[in-house]
Amino acid sequence: MTTTENAQPRLKTRYREEIKTALNDEFKYANVMQIPGVVKVVVNMGVGDAARDAKLINGAVTDLALITGQKPEIRKARKSIAQFKLREGMPIGARVTLRGDRMWEFLDRLVSIALPRIRDFRGLSPKQFDGKGNYTFGLTEQSMFHEIDVDSIDRPRGMDITVVTSATTDDEGRALLRQLGFPFKEN
């Protein structure tokens, strides 16, 4: 009989072994439970043109499923807006909430593979924190992820990525994400 060990995500192991102690040394927490960590990652893809053509949402759902490894939730319009020819209940986007090992694997792929593949990339803005240590940024197209076949893209779709942390201040959240390998611009 053989015993198989579950492979831990690389970034999760690094967080537990190195990053937690580095953050504790930097901020001098009274309790180890105060050390900030990543709670969840939300990937949202808005498809405004889906109001006119409902088939466009399928491409966004397929792309998000390939990128995240999880089936996206189709988001529907909450209100009708006549100027946008939008009715309540029409599909207008797709969203995935990643937690646990899938979240760590996605963050690892994002930081080590996807972000360096962006043309003319000079780093993420360090000013996009929400005041509670959570970070949101946008990507203009999905082709930087290696799971997406560049030839099969019907149109470029952008996405918003929100990294929710248990940090209480922006400085703690920034320190956590910098330790995880997020490339922030130096001002």
UniProtKB/Swiss-Prot annotation:
Record has Ligase as a keyword: no
Taxonomic source organism: Mycobacteroides abscessus (strain ATCC 19977 / DSM 44196 / CCUG 20993 / CIP 104536 / JCM 13569 / NCTC 13031 / TMC 1543 / L948) (Mycobacterium abscessus)
Name by which UniProt lists this protein: Large ribosomal subunit protein uL5
InterPro entries: Ribosomal_uL5, Ribosomal_uL5_bac-type, Ribosomal_uL5_C, Ribosomal_uL5_dom_sf, Ribosomal_uL5_N
Gene3D superfamilies (alphabetical): 3.30.1440.10
UniProt keyword terms in alphabetical order: Ribonucleoprotein, Ribosomal protein, RNA-binding, rRNA-binding, tRNA-binding
NCBIfam families in alphabetical order: PRK00010.1 (NF000585)
HAMAP family: Ribosomal_uL5_B
Domain of life: Bacteria
GO molecular function: rRNA binding; structural constituent of ribosome; tRNA binding
Pfam family, one: Ribosomal_L5
Assigned protein family: Belongs to the universal ribosomal protein uL5 family.
